[in-house]
Design a protein with these regions (language model features):
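N-terminal Rossmann NAD(P)H-binding glycine-rich loop of SDR-like oxidoreductase domains
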Residues: 8-30
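N-terminal Rossmann-fold cofactor-binding loop
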Residues: 38-42, 56
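Rossmann-fold cofactor-recognition segment
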Residues: 48-58, 78-80
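NAD(P)-cofactor binding segment of oxidoreductase domains
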Residues: 69-115, 131-142
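Active-site "gating" loop of Rossmann-like NAD(P)-dependent oxidoreductase/epimerase domains
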Residues: 104-128, 142-146, 164, 169
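Active-site Tyr-X1-5-Lys
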Residues: 126-153, 182
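Flexible, glycine-rich beta-alpha linker
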Residues: 152-173
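Alpha-helical substrate-binding/gating segment
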Residues: 178-188, 194-211
Length: 211
């Protein structure tokens, strides 16, 4: 993807999570990028990023805040439900050059294959999270087909980095597992502990998205 402009105005929605923070840090020091980050303002941003404080799920507030800005690229890390995808399509239709939706490998059906690529069937009956992300993808594809909405979809695997270690069963955070290790207690694993599982370091996601 090559965009013919000297300085790109980039908006990250989210921007302070496991996947998004390293991307935010890299773009913030890139002289060719004018970086904006929209979130609720609970975490500090790196120098060079302009923060827009807003609740992404409050559509009226979001519309009111963003009417003062224009962007070339929007990357959203926090779409989980179809209605959020619809909101974003309606909000940015005809206004941007590229929209990047961070989806997940949990959309894929893993029953028929261990090693998968983009051709794998998307029908994960075991993950509501994956099913919802699939519905979001379908809405973005439909928008692309109907009126050329400039969508790019990225499907990371489970990601570890700053404050997360590569664990397959951990709950919302890693500390409970670390505490069990420190206390010489058994650690829960998926299956019999020998099954294949893939994870991605946050800097690998950074390379993919920043390019």
């Amino acid at each position: 993807m090559i965009l013919n402009t000297k300085t790109l105005k980039v908006l990250l929605i989210g921007g302070t999570g496991t996947i998004s923070m390293p991307i935010c840090e890299k773009l913030a020091i890139d002289p060719s990028i004018d970086l904006y980050v929209l979130n609720r303002g609970h975490k500090a941003l790196p120098t060079g990023a302009t923060q827009i404080i807003c609740d992404f799920n409050d559509t009226e507030q979001l519309q009111d805040v963003l009417k003062h800005y224009s962007f070339d690229i929007v990357c959203n890390f926090i779409i989980y439900k179809p209605q959020q995808a619809i909101q974003q399509i309606e909000l940015f239709r005809g206004k941007i050059q590229q929209y990047i939706f961070i989806s997940t490998v949990a959309t894929y059906n893993h029953e028929t294959a261990i090693c998968i690529d983009e051709t794998q069937e998307q029908n994960n009956i075991y993950s509501q999270y994956g099913q919802d992300k699939t519905k979001c993808e379908q809405l973005f594809f439909k928008a692309y087909q109907q009126f050329g909405f400039p969508i790019t979809i990225v499907r990371p695997s489970q990601t570890y980095g700053y404050d997360r270690i590569p664990l397959s069963v951990k709950g919302k955070s890693c500390w409970s597992v670390v505490e069990r290790i420190l206390n010489d207690q058994p650690v829960i694993v998926h299956g019999d502990g020998k099954s294949t599982w893939h994870c991605t370091h946050t800097f690998d996601s950074l390379i993919t998205l920043s390019n």
